[in-house]
Each structure stands twice: as structure tokens, then as C-alpha cells.
Amino acid sequence: GKTAAFEKNTLDIAVVGHCPALDFVSITPIEVPTIYLAGDSTMADYGAEYPYHPAACYGGWGQALDLYLDGSVTVCNHAHNGRSTETFRNEGHFDLIQKQLRPGDFVVIQFGHNDQKHPHLQAYNGYPENLRRVIAEIRAKKALPILATPIARNVWTEQNGKLTYNDLLHDHAQACIALGKELNVPVLDLHQAAMDEIIRLGRDASKIYYHQGDWTHTNDYGAVRAAGYAAD
């Protein structure tokens, strides 16, 4: 197995269905801009379980983004579970993106869930500084950085029979927005969009979008919904 970031120069094709039959596959290369995704588990690709049910699988919103695109761009998802703005770079994942970047490409950057676990990666110190460095390096390649706020968790506090939404990622989301304004970088406010819907639906109804027993990681329903926030 691999213990570090690596480049996989293969095309994997899955054929599913009852008694599927495939006569041939025709692949035609086209030149279109690429949207690279840099982020954590809430953005990452996941494999499906069998028998498949969209509520039973983990799904990051990055794997569903191309459902909302028209073919004029392509998506390359480099997001990985457990990564922060620091470990994504230190483990070589950002180097792989830089190696492939061309002028006119896009890089969507979404971190925060794992940064907030570390004192040196808080919203007032390492988190925005690491994002600032990434933005500068993307622009040096004549590519276009896009920031995304960390998608909200379905976390509530119950007191005296009353539920109150607990916004655990407020500071990192606001730091991301502030940096975008400072550096003139577009910001996809996934945090606010997800939080608004969670509050509108309520704790229990929102569970349809999350993996069973998990208040952070979405299932495939949630992945498609969150990708819609980004596409909007």
C-alpha cells in the first residue's frame, strides 16, 4: 500500500446494474479547464457499499460536483480524510495539484474541520496564514483560487427540552470569508448554506443528509445537496 501522496495515472470505469453488458468504451481527450479540489473528508471521494443505498454510504460533496456542471470544465478531487491546511501540504497532496495546474484552471480550497483541533491552526493564526500561502502559489501558476467555508455540522444543544443549534465552525468560516475579501478571492459559503438548511429542517429531519450516527460526514444524499450549495 501507499503511505504518501502519489499520482495514479489510470482511468477507472465501473459498470453497474442488473446483468450489465458493455460492448466498448470510447474515450476522447478534450482540452477544458480543470477544477481541482483541495480539502478534507467532507469534500473527499468515497467508494460505494454493496448493496448500494445512498443513505448508507459516506459521500463528500466533491464527488458529486460534476452533477451540476455542463462539461465545459472537469473536476479532479484531491481531498483526503483527516487533512488540515497543514497536513495537506506536508504530506504532498498540494504538490500533486501544483504539478498539474495550468493557466485558467481553478482550485477550490475547503478546510477547517481538522484545523480547529489544533491550537496553532485556529481561525486567528495558522489557518488563514496557510490559506494565504496556498492562494499566492495558485496565482503564481496563473490559476484561479476559490475558497470554501467548512460545511456545517448537524450539532445541537438540548436544555430544558429546547434544542439550539451549536455552530462549532463559526470562527473558521468567518476567517475564510474575511481572507477572501482581503485578497479578492471568491468564497463559496457552504457553511452558511448548510447551516441554514439544518436549522430550517431541524436536528432530526437533517439526519437524512448525514451518515447514520455521524453529525459531520454526509451520505450520498448530503453530498449531492452540498455540491448544490457549491454550484449555486
Where does each model-flagged region fall?
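Short clusters of hydrophobic/aromatic residues that line enzyme substrate/ligand-binding pockets
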Residues: 43, 88, 210
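Beta-sandwich interaction modules
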Residues: 2-6
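Conserved phosphate-coordination/catalytic loops
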Residues: 56-59, 88-91, 125
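Serine-esterase "nucleophile elbow" of acetyl-processing enzymes
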Residues: 10-79, 94-107
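Conserved long hydrophobic alpha-helices within structured protein cores
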Residues: 1, 36-37, 142-143
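Short substrate-entry loop that stabilizes the transition state in hydrolases
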Residues: 44-46, 85, 117
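Alpha-helical cap/lid subdomain in secreted, periplasmic
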Residues: 64, 92-224, 228-232
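Functional beta-strand-loop-alpha-helix junction segments that form "active/interaction loops"
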Residues: 77-87
